[in-house]
Amino acid sequence: MNRSKYIDNIQLSENNNKLHAHIVGWYTGGKIDDHQFYVVVDGREAESHFERVDRFDIASQNNMSSGKRIGFNLVSDIDGYEAIETLQLRVRNAGKDELLLEMNKRNIKNIVAQTAIEYNIDEAILINSEGKEARLKV
């Protein structure tokens, strides 16, 4: 494999005109410890948070020493979903800036429409035929 970057998964969801972006992938260019992944929306940097992730599979395929933290997991919450025209994922590395992903409004809306909604349920209330309640903590 001779690729230096790849996006494994993009999840976009919208709630109350806020876009929630979760992007997972890997990048092997430049000095690994200097990677700063970030999101740009309509030409302006948006608040985002990322963490580095070990990707032993990719390190092995690229003949890199094992344990390199070349994977990334990025999350960003962006206000004004309806007005967003473009979204970019970029990386700063050793003084250089590189585009990893770019989506236009149509791409964003298509991914939002296809992203499954996840719910975390912490309690269920069961009511039997006699009207008695039973609470179940999950």
Model-derived segments and spans:
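Basic, ligand-binding patches in group-transfer machinery
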Residues: 1-138
